[in-house]
């Protein structure tokens, strides 16, 4: 499956608040198609821009050796980075606060512990999705930059990707640490509830093909310890979304046998989380 279709199918699976914060891959491709390739196209583009752009914009584009269309494309890429960073940092802060709250609640009564365990499971799933968000957007940027270089004969992919590597949305060390702490909390809670959740854990082991999907089935097999059908449905949706996200990410990372400086590391093991944060 081509990346654009894979990304689109992934976005459809996400919660509404996530959907508009992924890479605008289609818009970037449309903008790229407005850029004429080669020297003749560059001359024509320069003629077009003189009448329709401000002197400041033309001067800035010319100073960078770009046509107006090229400068607009790069400007759109920079806007995408700002969008990724804002969303990623907002989510990361939300997860830090939520995890601290769950850590403080996990020593409560048996009934409350079951509720906390379910919330940890859901939080774990959302953090896995945010890791996936980071990797998908990075991959999309690399692919669209490759198309840009090929069309224009420019070589902006390497310097732009070097800038991307320093962006908050790509720096997942803290997120990786939070994911591991979630797993440790789940391990600590398991002995406390081993009698009441033994049956659901057996089900988890058989169904948990991906990390994040394993614990997410807890809400559907706890004998009513977690009230609310809406909550059960949300956990089921989360499990499905995480599983689809990891499957798409595996497909993207293993889609080419050619390894380059721009390649993401492969996913190892069945849970997709053996690699350290970037």
UniProtKB/Swiss-Prot annotation:
Q: Which UniProt keywords apply?
A: Nucleus
Biological process (GO) annotations held by this record are: cellular response to cold; cellular response to phosphate starvation; negative regulation of unidimensional cell growth; regulation of leaf development
Source domain of life: Eukaryota
Primary localization class, coarse:
nucleus
UniProt cross-references to PROSITE patterns, sorted A to Z: SPX (PS51382)
**Which region ranges are annotated with the description Disordered?**
191-242, 255-278
Q: Which GO terms describe its cellular component?
A: nucleus
Matching CDD domains: SPX_AtSPX1_like
Q: Where in the cell is it found?
A: Nucleus
Q: Where is the SPX domain?
A: 1-162
Subunit structure and binding partners: Interacts (via SPX domain) with PHR2 (via C-terminus). Interacts with RLI1 in the nucleus to prevents its positive regulation of leaf inclination during phosphate (Pi) starvation.
UniProt domain comment:
The SPX domain is sufficient for inhibition of PHR2 binding to DNA.
Chain's role? Inhibits PHR2 DNA-binding activity via a phosphate (Pi)-dependent protein interaction. Together with SPX1, plays a negative role in the regulation of leaf inclination by preventing RLI1 transcription factor activity in Pi depleted conditions.
Q: What is this protein called?
A: SPX domain-containing protein 2
Name the species this protein comes from: Oryza sativa subsp. indica (Rice)
């Amino acid at each position: 499956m081509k990346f654009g279709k894979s990304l689109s199918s992934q976005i459809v699976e996400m919660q509404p608040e996530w959907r508009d914060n992924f890479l605008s891959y289609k818009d970037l491709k449309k903008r790229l198609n407005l850029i004429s390739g080669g020297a003749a196209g560059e001359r024509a583009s320069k003629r077009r821009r003189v009448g329709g752009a401000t002197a400041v914009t033309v001067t800035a584009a010319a100073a960078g050796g770009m046509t107006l269309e090229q400068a607009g494309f790069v400007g759109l890429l920079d806007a995408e980075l700002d969008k990724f960073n804002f969303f990623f940092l907002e989510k990361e802060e939300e997860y830090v606060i939520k995890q601290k709250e769950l850590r403080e609640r996990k020593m409560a009564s048996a009934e409350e512990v079951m509720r906390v365990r379910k919330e940890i499971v859901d939080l774990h799933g959302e953090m896995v999705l945010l890791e996936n968000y980071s990797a998908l957007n990075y991959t999309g940027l690399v692919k669209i930059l490759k198309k840009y270089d090929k069309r224009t004969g420019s070589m902006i992919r390497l310097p732009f990707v070097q800038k991307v590597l320093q962006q908050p949305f790509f720096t997942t060390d803290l997120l990786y640490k939070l994911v591991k702490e979630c797993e440790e909390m789940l391990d600590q809670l398991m002995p406390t509830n081993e009698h009441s959740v033994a049956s659901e854990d057996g089900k988890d082991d058989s169904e948990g093909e991906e990390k994040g999907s394993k614990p997410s089935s807890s809400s559907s097999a706890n004998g009513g310890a977690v009230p609310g059908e809406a909550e059960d449905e949300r956990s089921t949706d989360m499990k499905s979304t995480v599983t689809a996200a990891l499957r798409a990410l595996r497909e993207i990372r293993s889609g080419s046998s050619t390894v380059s400086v721009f390649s993401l590391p492969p996913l190892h093991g069945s849970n997709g989380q053996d690699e350290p944060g970037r």
